[in-house]
Regions:
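Conserved phosphate-binding/catalytic region of the ribokinase-like
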Residues: 50-163
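Conserved beta-alpha-beta core of the PfkB/ribokinase-like small-molecule kinase fold
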Residues: 1-59, 75-78
Length: 163
């Protein structure tokens, strides 16, 4: 961090890798003061806390002033706590889902690329949703280069700042 490097952590929680969810919560929570961005899947947080109100669980668990938090919610709106406020971005509707492999990683890649390019949190999340939507239209984790969306064109806002 002293050299200007941003540190990102994706929870990618797998219960079988931890003896108890409380140990994972403590380990992950301890990273909040070290990392710049935490990416968490809604399912991961629900499993970690044993509850469905994931945004409340995150608020109780993390100090949002210390790191940017991105809650990925599958086909639902993503929620981002950054720059002192909460942001939301709508997921793109996909008529025919072929394979969800790499959807979360695709969201993360586009989100981070957009943020590093100076995009606001909501614009970055929209870029993440756009790439994830394209990826799930294809089998497997690697899509044809011709199917890659131009994420620079993701400019029209469909998200909202939550007061």
């Amino acid at each position: 961090k002293r050299r200007g490097i941003r540190i990102v952590f994706d929870t990618n929680y797998r219960a079988r890798n931890w003896p108890d969810p409380s140990i994972a919560r403590t380990a992950y929570g301890g990273l909040a003061g070290v990392i710049d961005v935490m990416l968490a899947g809604e399912e991961d947080i629900a499993l970690l806390f044993g509850r469905s109100d994931t945004d409340v669980a995150l608020r109780e668990w993390l100090d949002f002033e210390r790191c940017e938090v991105v809650l990925k919610c599958g086909s639902g709106d993503s929620r981002i706590w950054a720059e002192g406020r909460e942001w939301r971005a709508s997921a793109e509707h996909v008529d025919k889902v072929v394979d969800t492999t790499a959807a979360g990683d695709s969201f993360a890649a586009a989100f981070l690329a957009a943020r590093l390019s100076g995009a606001a949190p909501d614009e970055a999340a929209r870029a993440g949703h756009r790439l994830a939507a394209e990826v799930i239209r294809h089998p497997g984790a690697i899509i044809p280069i011709t199917a890659m969306p131009n994420l620079a064109l993701v400019t029209e806002s469909t998200s909202a700042i939550v007061p």
